[in-house]
């Protein structure tokens, strides 16, 4: 169990570093260097790199090494288009499965988001944006859908952080979250699904307007 936990931690750390932009595309990930940085042997690092290759984030070239693949412009666009459909489904399901406790938690997150939007506290807004989506995925009541959407959400961390830092998008994003929440609270599946889809589509539009080349 401890060995599995260590491998999982090493994988998650390297994965997060790639998604946060610590490495450039084609940077070499040396097992010995990573092991020293993380305080582990080369074995869990090697296993983590193999797992990252399966996710498409790393390219392992035999007898040469492991290199960062990263996320391309097309990857970002594809992720948001897929997320649009799946978050719509999640919001639809949430109208039937959300609990009173989950509604209260989402309401609290929204109130905090609205406050920090007015204060233009973008760092806190990024955290609250992530929290709202986590709560939405949980409210959908599907472990599988939650896992898929959480992975997609992680893949575009850098992009989300950049766009939420613009005042116009932070305001509209918070307003859209509120509308999705109200539709779920009213148990209106068609409205909740449509609003959730539009929210994600508006996000990719703001990303394109901002310029992906400034982020990736």
Question: What spans do the regions from the language model cover?
Answer:
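Short linear motifs at protein or domain termini
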Residues: 1-96, 102, 138, 204, ...
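Short helix-capping/hinge motifs at transmembrane helix termini and TM-loop junctions
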Residues: 95-96, 141, 165-166
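Mobile beta-alpha loop/short-helix "lid" or hinge segments that flank ligand
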Residues: 54, 58-59, 152-154, 168-170
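A generic alpha-helix signature
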Residues: 5, 9, 127, 172-175
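Short helix-capping and inter-helix turn/linker motifs at the boundaries of alpha-helical repeat units
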Residues: 5, 103-104, 168-171
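Bacterial carbohydrate/catabolite-sensing allosteric modules
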Residues: 120, 168, 187, 194, ...
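Conserved amphipathic alpha-helical segments that form helical-bundle/coiled-coil interaction surfaces
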Residues: 79, 100-161, 175-183, 191, ...
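Short amphipathic alpha-helical interaction/hinge segments
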Residues: 157-167, 204-211
């Amino acid at each position: 169990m401890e060995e599995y936990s260590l491998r999982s931690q090493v994988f998650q750390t390297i994965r997060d570093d790639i998604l946060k932009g610590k490495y450039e595309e084609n940077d070499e990930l040396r097992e010995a260097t990573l092991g020293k940085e993380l305080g582990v042997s080369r074995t869990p690092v090697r296993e983590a790199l193999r797992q990252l290759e399966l996710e498409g984030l790393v390219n392992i070239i035999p007898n040469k090494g492991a290199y960062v693949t990263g996320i391309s412009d097309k990857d970002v666009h594809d992720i948001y288009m897929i997320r649009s459909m799946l978050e719509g489904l999640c919001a639809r399901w949430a109208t039937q499965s959300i609990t009173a406790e989950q509604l209260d938690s989402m309401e609290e997150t929204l109130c905090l988001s609205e406050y920090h939007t007015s204060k233009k506290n973008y760092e806190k807004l990024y955290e609250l944006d992530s929290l709202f989506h986590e709560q939405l995925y949980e409210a959908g009541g599907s472990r599988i859908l939650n896992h898929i959407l959480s992975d997609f959400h992680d893949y575009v961390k850098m992009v989300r952080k950049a766009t939420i830092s613009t005042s116009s998008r932070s305001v509209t994003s918070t307003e859209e979250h509120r509308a999705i929440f109200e539709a779920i609270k009213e148990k209106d599946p068609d409205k909740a699904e449509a609003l959730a889809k539009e929210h994600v589509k508006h996000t990719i539009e703001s990303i394109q307007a901002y310029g992906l080349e400034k982020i990736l």
